[in-house]
């Protein structure tokens, strides 16, 4: 998340576990507040199905489904092909900023090759599709946070029943 945006919010951190985040591990979650009201979140997430293994990411979005930012934290993708998900290699990941995710069934939020509106990069399909799917699942999760906020404040970190 750009520092000029990040520093305009108050933040509270939580631990969370949910299948929409790509694995069965506990992930960090930061709820962002504006005027003492929760408005967005940053979530650590995993794209488990990258070409060369799991891709760890941060996704930030408003509760209405608008993506603030997405960044890859770590990956083992093929140099010169799949590694274009990394901001230090390519700006491909920045195309998600400002996009909206309507639902898990959002037909537009997939690669153009599969009928969606997102351009992949040359030479790779699996890696950009994995990242795209992970961002979509994570934003769907973020959109549910207002419904589980009371549970978060009670220290309950696993919410499978809310996300079926």
From Swiss-Prot:
Domain of life of the source: Bacteria
GO molecular function terms attached to this record: electron transfer activity; FMN binding; oxidoreductase activity
Gene Ontology BP terms: electron transport chain
Cofactors, names only: FMN
Enzyme Commission identifier(s): 1.18.1.-
Residues the record lists as FMN phosphoryl threonine modifications: 125
Family: Belongs to the RnfG family.
Function: Part of a membrane-bound complex that couples electron transfer with translocation of ions across the membrane.
Name assigned to this protein: Ion-translocating oxidoreductase complex subunit G
Origin species: Buchnera aphidicola subsp. Acyrthosiphon pisum (strain APS)
Gene: rnfG
């Amino acid at each position: 998340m750009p520092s000029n945006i990040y520093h305009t919010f108050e933040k509270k951190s939580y631990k969370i576990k949910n299948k929409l985040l790509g694995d069965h591990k506990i992930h960090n979650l930061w709820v962002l507040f504006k005027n003492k009201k929760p408005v967005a979140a940053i979530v650590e997430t995993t794209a488990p199905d990258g070409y060369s293994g799991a891709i760890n990411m941060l996704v930030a979005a408003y509760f209405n489904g608008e993506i603030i930012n997405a960044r890859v934290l770590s990956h083992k993708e093929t140099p010169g092909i799949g590694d274009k998900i990394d901001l230090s290699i390519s700006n491909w990941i920045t195309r998600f900023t400002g996009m909206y995710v309507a639902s898990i069934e959002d037909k537009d939020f997939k690669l153009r090759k599969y009928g969606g509106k997102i351009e992949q990069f040359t030479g790779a399909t699996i890696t950009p599709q994995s990242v795209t799917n992970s961002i979509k699942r994570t934003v769907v999760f973020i959109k549910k946070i207002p419904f589980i906020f009371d549970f978060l404040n009670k220290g309950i970190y696993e919410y499978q029943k809310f996300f079926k």
